């Protein structure tokens, strides 16, 4: 991953790097790889994440169609 440093502004470059890493999901990946996750736990986690995604998408779709009031 590469970030340009303009005018020796290291702080701005660090912020840009952190933003890129956040978008790419690197922080989440590092956190997940911190400890070993059993395959059964991984399947359960991924299934729960998929259910959450589907529910979120359905909720957004319902809000867009006016069936549910926005929070």
UniProtKB/Swiss-Prot annotation:
Protein name: Small ribosomal subunit protein bS21B
Gene for this chain: rpsU2
Protein's GO biological process: translation
Record GO cellular component, one term: ribonucleoprotein complex
InterPro entries: Ribosomal_bS21, Ribosomal_bS21_CS, Ribosomal_bS21_sf
Lineage, broadest ranks: Bacteria, Pseudomonadati, Pseudomonadota, Alphaproteobacteria, Hyphomicrobiales
Family annotation (HAMAP family): Ribosomal_bS21
Coiled-coil annotated residue ranges, if any: none
Record-linked PANTHER family: MITOCHONDRIAL 28S RIBOSOMAL PROTEIN S21, SMALL RIBOSOMAL SUBUNIT PROTEIN BS21M
Pfam families linked: Ribosomal_S21 (PF01165)
Swiss-Prot/TrEMBL keywords: Ribonucleoprotein, Ribosomal protein
Recorded family membership: Belongs to the bacterial ribosomal protein bS21 family.
Superkingdom of source: Bacteria
GO molecular function, one term: structural constituent of ribosome
């Amino acid at each position: 991953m590469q970030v340009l440093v303009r005018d020796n502004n290291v702080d701005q470059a660090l912020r840009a790097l952190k933003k890129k890493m956040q978008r790419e999901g690197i922080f989440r990946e590092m956190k997940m790889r911190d400890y070993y996750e059993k395959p059964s736990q991984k399947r359960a986690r991924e299934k729960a994440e998929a259910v959450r995604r589907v529910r979120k998408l359905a909720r957004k779709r319902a809000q867009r169609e006016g069936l549910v009031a926005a929070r």
